[in-house]
């Protein structure tokens, strides 16, 4: 008895040949398969499975039968014993090796269903051929092409290890966070892959490697909002979505404070936003974020400009604070100059009142020419586009009109000369002098503008009648000194309108 080969691959045909002779060595010719079967007491082919039991006569008493190599094993034999024999005969030794890995028999499994980025994923592959034989040389067969572990990479220096029974293991490192992931096994010749159980990779702890603190406005004004964003990611760049508690006290911004009512809010993709408030001017200011002992600096640096506003008004040698309410009075030709905080220059702004009758030149000098009955808003916009708009508002309550030197006449005539309004009293024009000096205060014409003679021809007369009288004598107002005294004869007319 003999086999056609000494080595087989599982699934291959295995041909057994027996030579039947009588005791004198004569070949037994012409035996049918049925006759041979009737003689057989036992017939076995190690590691093989029968395809059929049909014996086929060849020549010289040789008969063959074909089985299929099946179970992988070494040192196998085929054996035969006829009923008349005292012992069996055996073939030479042969071996059966496993066949190619079969998709229907092989598996791939991940050791968990949930990982944290940076965790080790143990992948177990079992390789079997179509006959269920364990494949023992998988270490050389498995590679990055036929085994793919989604969102993970092989751990450096870690290779496939054979554990016996067709089982192989290797460690991978989880990196990109995602749900519904799997590992795939697709050996050569397979039309599609086998898949492991699904698993999820979650982000790891916040890491300084990719996290950022971003200043979203690099130039703001004192008191203005400063928007800030933070990007929180783990070592692998995965967005961290549970960082609100970490950020509460983790961010420092120079010359900036927390804005009341504002908190960090998560906007997605690991990005958090918050609005702070700039409280003090400064240049090249810095910021940082410090979490669990590590620190990263915000980018870019930023500047806080001073909040510029009108600090005071310069009026004919006197300054009024912007909060004093100047001007309450006005006349055609009245002038005053805006003085800004932080020693800022008026020439660095483009000034406008946006209404006819109010002119503002490049030096911030305001000239009134027409009565404006509503509130006036003067705006200065920075020429370089940096900083806040400077805004000054005022409303004229009393508008004075000089009738000119040519109007000089008696009080009775002047008293009826005001087409609009009426003749003002002395105290509407100026307060009484103290120590010979008329006070410069808001609320009276001379108190606000001083020597009215300095305003061109607006007050060309020497004096003007007032409605104030003492013992039947009316007072005359001196536009140069601001002093009113009892007078007779003629004087010029001055009218006031109220708004």
Where are the regions that the model predicts?
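Short S/T/G/P-enriched beta-strand
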Residues: 1-29, 42, 72-134, 186-239, ...
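Short flexible loop/turn segments that cap and initiate beta-strands
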Residues: 13-15, 20-55, 119-121, 127-158, ...
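Aromatic sugar-binding surface patches on proteins
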Residues: 57-65, 162-170, 266-274, 361-365
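Short, hydrophobic beta-strand segments
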Residues: 65-71, 170-176, 274-280, 366-370
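A short beta-strand micro-motif common to beta-rich folds, especially ectodomain repeats
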Residues: 75-82, 180-187, 284-292, 373-384
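Extracellular adhesion/carbohydrate-recognition regions
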Residues: 312-313, 317-334, 339-346, 352-423, ...
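Short, structured beta-strand segments at or near domain termini in extracellular proteins/domains
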Residues: 377-381, 385, 391-398, 465, ...
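An exposed tryptophan-centered "aromatic clamp" motif
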Residues: 428-480, 497-498
